[in-house]
């Protein structure tokens, strides 16, 4: 069934605090503003911040909204997110399924991005993106198959 991303998840766009609050002494929350430390599934951290405006929580999907648009990682810690990321939290689908459906539709998100030099996607375009969403049983099967 076709649904928008906003119907199956909540989208929080990142916002960068002043760099005066950044550190590499692990004070405050880990801070990500793009995909430079993304791994295959989870990011690593090289910057922390003692002040933040926007956050991601364990289980959220981290989604790049600036070039490259559409890279995803799973959030396993409470972190601060900057302008290059959105935190997407599943509301009506399985969290791990949300990760897979976003990953599978990366080219669709890239096509919806704009910008002549640096591609980006805004919250409205992201939340209104139409996705083919599987039933709860199919989601469970997909998650189980992908984890195996």
Language model segments and positions:
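Non-catalytic DNA-recognition/assembly elements of restriction-modification systems
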Residues: 1-16, 128-148
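Sequence-specific dsDNA recognition surfaces
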Residues: 4-21, 30-58
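Short amphipathic beta-strand starts and helix->beta connectors
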Residues: 70-72, 112-115
């Amino acid at each position: 069934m076709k649904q928008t991303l906003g119907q199956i998840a909540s989208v929080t766009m990142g916002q960068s605090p002043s760099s005066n609050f950044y550190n590499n002494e692990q004070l405050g929350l880990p801070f990500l503003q793009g995909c430079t430390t993304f791994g295959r599934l989870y990011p690593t951290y090289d910057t922390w911040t003692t002040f933040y405006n926007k956050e991601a929580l364990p289980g959220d999907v981290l989604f790049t909204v600036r070039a490259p648009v559409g890279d995803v990682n799973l959030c396993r810690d409470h972190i601060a997110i900057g302008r290059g990321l959105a935190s997407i939290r599943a509301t009506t689908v399985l969290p791990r399924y949300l990760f897979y459906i976003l990953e599978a539709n990366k080219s669709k998100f890239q096509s919806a991005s704009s910008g002549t030099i640096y591609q980006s996607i805004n919250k409205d375009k992201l939340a209104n993106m139409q996705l083919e969403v599987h039933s709860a049983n199919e989601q469970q099967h997909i998650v189980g198959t992908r984890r195996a």
